[in-house]
From Swiss-Prot:
The keyword Protein transport does not apply. The keyword Cell cycle does not apply. It catalyses: uridine(38/39/40) in tRNA = pseudouridine(38/39/40) in tRNA. This is tRNA pseudouridine synthase A. Gene3D superfamilies: Pseudouridine synthase I, catalytic domain, C-terminal subdomain (3.30.70.660), Pseudouridine synthase I, catalytic domain, N-terminal subdomain (3.30.70.580). CDD domains: PseudoU_synth_EcTruA (cd02570). It is an enzyme of class 5 (isomerase).
């Protein structure tokens, strides 16, 4: 068997998420159909991050195996041709032949996410579905201060979905930075792995700080409560991007 890695960009808006789901259209299904169309083989691909419905990717990574050897450029171009023909909002940025022990999910050393908040009075037109529109002016400096209280190895029970299937709520958050760029607030989060809904839960809590309703101490207290009920409202999916996966 020949193993291939693909780097993927997609608009999460039209999809029920990355993972294949019965009766719903997923990014995984779209790519698997494209692989079958050009190779004649039915495969199951494994992705580095199982993004939710509406979440985008600039640098998702996946792998799959084919019985026949193919040139990497041919794999990329053939997949893109079939994805385009099918009207999918998915682009294969790169394809590469890799060792058989490479695993897009379990070989990953770090995952990097970006959350975009469009912080302006006027609603979004061109960027609708690409960012969270928040009309009220947010204090990015206060949000960043609170974010630093959440960095490190912690029990993140407060910031994970009740549907999260991870065996342990303990994760090491390597980076959580908040910066303002004009009318946009960018929140960058990095870790080896994340809990389900962790980034969006963190963003929702930081927004409460930015509005002045919470302080950095309140955000830290929410973390220490280890109680989902202590979390701020979960941020919507359209502002979240899987930017890069490190190996």
């Amino acid at each position: 068997m020949h193993r291939f890695r693909i780097d993927i960009e997609y608009d999460g808006g039209p999809y029920a998420g990355w993972q294949r789901q019965a009766g719903q259209h997923s990014v995984q299904e779209a790519i698997e159909k494209a692989i079958a169309a050009f190779s004649g083989e039915e495969v199951t691909i494994r992705g580095a991050g199982r993004t939710d419905a509406g979440v985008h990717a600039l640098g998702q990574v996946a792998h799959f195996d084919l019985s026949r050897e193919w040139k990497s450029d041919k794999v990329r171009d053939a997949l893109n041709a079939h994805l385009t023909l099918a009207g999918e909002a998915v682009s294969i940025l790169r394809a590469e032949a890799v060792a058989e022990d490479f695993d897009a999910r379990f070989s990953a050393k770090a995952r990097h996410y970006l959350y975009r908040i469009a912080n302006r009075r006027s609603p979004l037109a061109l960027e609708r579905g690409r960012a969270w529109h928040v009309a009220r002016r947010l204090d990015a400096a206060a949000m960043h201060e609170a974010a630093q209280r959440l960095v490190g190895k912690h029990d993140f029970t407060t910031f994970r979905s009740v549907q999260c299937q991870a065996k342990s709520p303990v994760k090491t958050l390597d980076r959580l930075d908040v910066t303002r760029v004009g009318d946009e607030i960018e929140i960058h989060a990095s870790a080896r792995s994340f809990l389900h809904n962790q980034v969006r839960s963190l963003v929702g809590t930081l927004k409460k700080v930015g509005e002045g309703g919470w302080t950095a101490d309140d955000a830290q207290a929410a973390l220490q409560a280890r109680d989902r009920a202590a979390c701020g409202p979960v941020a919507p999916p359209q502002g979240l991007y899987l930017v890069r996966v490190d190996y």
